[in-house]
């Protein structure tokens, strides 16, 4: 089986239709040798200082450096900041799909952000399967089929990921620098 990950449910459904994955499951579609699933945008974020057990940031802690790990995106609730339950549930679906497949296709947006979204999930879930990149800028049947015929190894997009990840870490530092 081959997993395809998109960053939006509607994109996932469109790609699933074209590749023949017509059977609807909870959070993914399957068929034609594919399992197509999706995220709801960025479901992961760089960890906050509190995630490492630090209750509050002191002046001595500056400059802050982003921790090298990711956490599930938090949402503001009545009881404070808690993991986004929809993200947690869909991450379980994505993990199940990835575990059932021997190849993963990154079909997130053809951009730095789309590449970072995929790489963060791939790393967060501890994936070891080979990954390929579907690079398309249109959801027409022709564009999807041409993209599927011209998949490229993910490592060819390493610099795109590094650019987005560097910007993400710089944004983290900028947000955390305000006391």
Language-model features, listed with the residues they occupy:
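Intrinsically disordered, low-complexity regulatory segments
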Residues: 1-177
């Amino acid at each position: 089986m081959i997993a395809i990950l998109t960053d939006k449910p509607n994109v996932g459904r469109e790609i699933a239709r074209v590749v023949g994955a017509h059977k609807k499951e909870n959070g993914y579609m399957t068929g034609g040798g594919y399992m197509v699933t999706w995220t709801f945008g960025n479901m992961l974020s760089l960890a906050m200082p509190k995630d490492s057990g630090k209750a509050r940031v002191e002046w001595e802690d500056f400059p802050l450096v982003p921790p090298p790990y990711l956490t599930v995106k938090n949402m503001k609730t009545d009881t404070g900041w808690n993991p986004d339950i929809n993200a947690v549930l869909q991450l379980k679906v994505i993990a199940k799909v990835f575990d059932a497949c021997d190849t993963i296709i990154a079909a997130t947006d053809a951009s730095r952000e789309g590449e970072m979204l995929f790489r963060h999930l791939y790393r967060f879930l501890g994936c070891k399967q080979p990954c390929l990149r579907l690079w398309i800028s249109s959801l027409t049947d022709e564009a999807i089929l041409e993209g599927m015929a011209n998949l490229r190894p993910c490592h060819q997009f390493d610099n795109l990921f590094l650019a987005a990840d560097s910007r993400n870490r710089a944004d983290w530092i900028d947000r955390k620098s305000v006391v």
